[in-house]
Amino acid sequence: MATSISTQRGQVFIGELPQDFLRIAPTQQQQQIQLDAQAAQQLQYSGVMGTMGRLSITVVQAKLAKNYGMTRMDPYCRIRLGYAVYETPTAHNGAKNPRWNKVIQCTIPPGVDSFYLEIFDERAFSMDDRIAWTHITIPETLKEGKHVDEWFSLSGRQGDDKEGMINLVMSYTSVPAMMPAQPVVLMPTVYQQGVGYVPIAGPVYNPGMPMIASPPAVNPQHQTQEVDIQSIKDMFPTIDPEVIRSVLEAQGGNRDAAINSLLQMVEDS
């Protein structure tokens, strides 16, 4: 317990300081703000249950209005769904009637109800040329367990819905979505007179995951040195290994320089 004594400069504390030294207890409003912030963090990082869909899109074929290639046209499809991008293989020399028969498995995040499809002509010596595109809304009938096999109009240089058509087969599967809970650091707020105090959090480990100790690192230089010592020992069997080690370290690990030094030692002896 600290004791108070008077000096020429005023009253000072001697000994262990109290826990509330130079600290002001938070008001009810400050406590409420802190609790609200903690609740917001818990809502943000806690596991959120919901549903998300898995959409299967079979890109069958297309019937295009025009061949934009100089000698041939090698079309491929690109699908953008949410933040993900999927592509089909190139239908080499597919021209106006490319066939892909490519099945693409897409995960539909919550809130996404459409995807964007583009057709490109693959070029060998220049950038690929975009020749057709369309925006497709995912049919609601898919969520009822039905399959959709339809032709969708394509837009392009010929105009809206005038660049041809593409055949897609779609099916939908609902899967549960679980976001893993994240560890949350809740540090007490300390209010200090005249000084801003920012709590520093140490490492936080999720109690649900066991800590795995990392294996000790092996120094490759040490292994190399042991190999060199053994090989030099075979050349100089009468010299103590510790002497060889000392000479090798003195030469900075240079094996040839160490051998020359040992030869000089043997000749001098």
Swiss-Prot record:
Keywords, ordered alphabetically: Autophagy, Cytoplasm, Immunity, Inflammatory response, Innate immunity, Repeat
Motif residue range(s): AIM2: 151-154
Coiled-coil intervals: none
Full protein name: Toll-interacting protein A
Domain CUE: 224-267
Sequence motif AIM1, residues: 133-136
Biological process according to GO: autophagy; inflammatory response; innate immune response; phosphorylation; ubiquitin-dependent protein catabolic process
Principal cellular location given in the protein's record: cytoplasm
Role according to the record: Component of the signaling pathway of IL-1 and Toll-like receptors. Inhibits cell activation by microbial products. Connects the ubiquitin pathway to autophagy by functioning as a ubiquitin-ATG8 family adapter and thus mediating autophagic clearance of ubiquitin conjugates. The TOLLIP-dependent selective autophagy pathway plays an important role in clearance of cytotoxic polyQ proteins aggregates.
Subunit structure: Interacts with ATG8 family proteins (via AIM motifs), and ubiquitin (via CUE domain).
The species this protein was found in: Xenopus laevis (African clawed frog)
Localisation: Cytoplasm
Domain C2: residue ranges: 35-152
